[in-house]
UniProtKB/Swiss-Prot annotation:
The lineage of its organism: Bacteria, Bacillati, Cyanobacteriota, Cyanophyceae, Synechococcales. Pfam families: DAP_epimerase. Belongs to the diaminopimelate epimerase family. HAMAP family: DAP_epimerase. Its EC number is 5.1.1.7. This is Diaminopimelate epimerase. It comes from Prochlorococcus marinus (strain NATL2A). GO terms for cellular component: cytosol. It comes from the Bacteria. Substrate binds at N13, N70, G80, N81, N167, N200, E218, R219, G228, T229. Homodimer. One of its GO terms (biological process) is lysine biosynthetic process via diaminopimelate.
Length: 284
């Protein structure tokens, strides 16, 4: 059966979007027969993407519900770049109109979004989670109220931190982000037993109090050009440790996100673009 799709990207973090509000796509994707999610996301034999977004009717009086799948078929709780892509899709299809606040239902809870054109989509990402039990992580809370510990990787002792934005994140500070063995460290740390549900991994280089560089190893995807929830988690940890202000530009391989955590309390706000790449139809 032929189904329409659109491909969107937020800072190069790309997604195949299906409107699943009036068909059986949700059931088909849940079954993932013959690993067809992986096939669709394959950049050589499929459409190619970091993940898939299904737009569904909300169960909680939100505008829509977002379900997301990683390229390996796993289902994460939330995705910051993905939710901006969903908003851009709805905007391009004239569904948003003059709404000033667009509530989206996700596996991580209700997320409030705002749009001023597809180049400028702001997301209230909710309050960060720093309780080790709720992240979850086996790292212990340090004196600054951030989960922290060390992990040994061959001859390296890595000082790591943790936070959650509805999904788990490990933060590792490095002096030269381009000089690390990224593939080796990322794949090892994603599956480390200090994170029972695996984790997204972010290598962070501090530029100054208002600017940081981040390189992303995404859980279930591997290297990606950006991670919205990860950018927020990084800002939460850097601001708690006094390495940045409560707002900073986060420079990822795919571009810049603006992240703010006012007064180090309440929700984190993320702002950035999401743009259409192309549309088509495919047999599923």
């Amino acid at each position: 059966m032929k189904n329409n799709f659109s491909k969107y990207q937020g800072l190069g973090n790309d997604f195949i979007i299906f409107d699943a509000r009036s068909n059986n796509l949700d059931h088909l994707f849940s079954k993932n027969k013959d690993n067809f999610i992986e096939h669709l996301c394959n950049r050589n034999f499929g459409i190619g993407a970091d993940g898939i977004i299904l737009i569904l009717e909300s169960n909680n009086k939100c505008f829509v519900r977002m379900k997301i799948y990683n390229s390996d078929g796993s289902e994460p709780e939330m995705c910051g770049n993905g939710i901006r892509c969903l908003i851009a899709f709805l905007n391009d299809n004239n569904e948003i109109n003059e709404l000033s606040e667009i509530p989206i239902e996700t596996k991580a809870g209700l997320i409030l979004t705002y749009i001023d054109g597809n180049e400028n989509i702001k997301v209230n990402m909710g309050e960060p989670i720093l309780s080790p039990l709720d992240i979850p992580t086996k790292l212990l809370m340090n004196s600054l109220k951030v989960p922290n510990g060390v992990i040994t990787l061959k001859d390296q002792i890595l000082n790591v931190y943790a936070a959650s934005m509805g999904n788990p994140h490990m933060i590792v500070f490095v002096n030269d982000i381009e000089g690390i063995p990224f593939q080796e460290w990322g794949s090892f740390l994603e599956k480390h037993n200090t994170f029972p549900n695996d984790t997204n991994v972010h290598f962070v280089e501090i530029i100054d109090k208002s600017n940081i560089k981040v390189k992303v190893w995404e859980r279930g995807c591997g290297p990606t050009l950006a991670c919205g929830t990860g950018a927020c988690a990084c800002l939460v940890v850097t601001s708690k440790l006094g390495k940045t202000l409560n707002n900073a530009n986060v420079y990822l391989p795919g571009g810049k996100l603006e992240v703010e955590w006012p007064n180090q309390s309440g929700p984190v706000f993320m702002q950035g673009p999401a743009l259409k790449v192309f549309s088509g139809e495919i047999d599923i």
